[in-house]
A protein has these predicted regions:
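Basic, Lys/Arg-enriched alpha-helical interface segments
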Residues: 2-54
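Aromatic side chains
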Residues: 19-24, 32, 60, 68, ...
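Basic/aromatic recognition patch in beta-strand/loop cores that engages polyanionic ligands
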Residues: 48-78
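Conserved N-terminal glycine/acidic-rich loop preference
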Residues: 8-12, 59, 68, 91-93
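Enriched for short, Lys/Arg-rich terminal
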Residues: 68, 73-98
């Protein structure tokens, strides 16, 4: 499978990195980053293992990594990672343009 990371998901990742690094330090960020990488690898290996959410548009799947939820969709042989959001965020608001 091919994967494409949206600009929004990339920005989410940068924001997670900045927040975690500033609040908890480099070691915690490195641990969290490893877990996020493992989460992405799991999606690539098992693209239909995610779950649906009522607050995310139809056709999208969610996969939880610690406090964050990776939102993605699968089309043909491509996985589109569209957002990486904190589990306490308002997902409906984040997807109002989709």
């Amino acid at each position: 499978m091919t994967s494409i990371v949206s600009e929004e998901a990339y920005e989410d990742l940068v924001n997670i990195q900045n927040y975690t690094y500033s609040k908890y330090g480099e070691n915690q960020w490195q641990e969290y980053g490893i877990d996020l990488d493992k989460g992405i690898a799991h999606i690539l290996e098992h693209p239909f293992s995610g779950h649906t959410r009522k607050d995310v548009p139809n056709g999208y799947q969610a996969s939880t990594v610690r406090e964050h939820v990776m939102i993605y969709r699968v089309e043909d042989k491509t996985i589109y990672l569209v957002r990486i959001l904190h589990g306490k965020m308002n997902f409906t608001f984040q997807f109002s343009g989709y």
